[in-house]
Design a protein with these regions (language model features):
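RecA-like P-loop NTPase motor core of helicase/translocase proteins
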Residues: 1-198
Length: 198
């Protein structure tokens, strides 16, 4: 049995477009590769993201969708252990809220491919609260693969479950120049010993 997906659900398209509009005006970073893995150049997302653009775009998206307008960006900040020692990381946090049963998983998976199409972003990590949800996302990636390939002109993408003991998997994520989707649980993300935190 094969599932048929409707690519034209208006409320889903509005959610995808809302996320994509956050990055309007951001440019491809002009600098070369930022880091290396074992002497090999890694391929980062290359979008120059300015906080003033993000805030202006966020306000426009909120106004368009009848959402109370934020006066400032909200951030997640924490200390993490890296190969260069303890570092504080800080990044903007955005939320897309949808009712249960409206296709949230479909929307955020399609949003990843839309961000690739519009802005050339390649690296995506999906962090979920449980193993059951992780398995559901991996299953959804499998059953939507043909549908997404038709929508995005056979754009190649690779998805998999993060496994901390699989160093080659993390290496592929870093070095690949195609869309990479890594799915992991919050517990595996929070372990200090994980390769992803180094």
């Amino acid at each position: 049995m094969q599932f048929k997906f409707d690519a034209n659900q208006d409320y889903q398209l509005r959610a995808i477009e809302a996320v994509a509009r956050l990055f309007e005006g951001c440019r491809f970073a002009s600098s070369g590769l930022d880091f290396k893995w074992g002497g090999l150049p890694a391929v980062p997302n290359r979008l120059e993201i300015r906080e003033d653009f993000l805030l202006d775009n966020l306000k426009k998206v909120q106004q368009t969708n009848g959402i109370p307008v934020d006066s400032e960006l909200k951030y997640i900040e924490r200390e993490i252990q890296t190969a260069n020692g303890l570092q504080v990381v800080r990044f903007p946090n955005f939320s897309v809220e949808m009712e249960t049963g409206t296709g949230k998983t479909y929307v955020y998976l399609r949003t990843l491919l839309e961000l690739n199409k519009q802005y050339g972003l390649l690296k995506f990590i999906i962090v979920v609260p449980s193993v059951a949800i992780r398995e559901g996302i991996l299953k959804t990636l499998k059953i939507t693969e043909q549908h997404f390939r038709e929508l995005y002109h056979n754009q190649p993408y690779h998805y998999y479950e993060y496994q901390s003991e699989n160093l080659s998997q993390v290496r592929q994520f870093s070095l690949s120049n195609q869309v990479e989707i890594m799915v992991m649980t919050i517990d595996s993300f929070n372990k200090a010993s994980n390769v992803i935190n180094q």
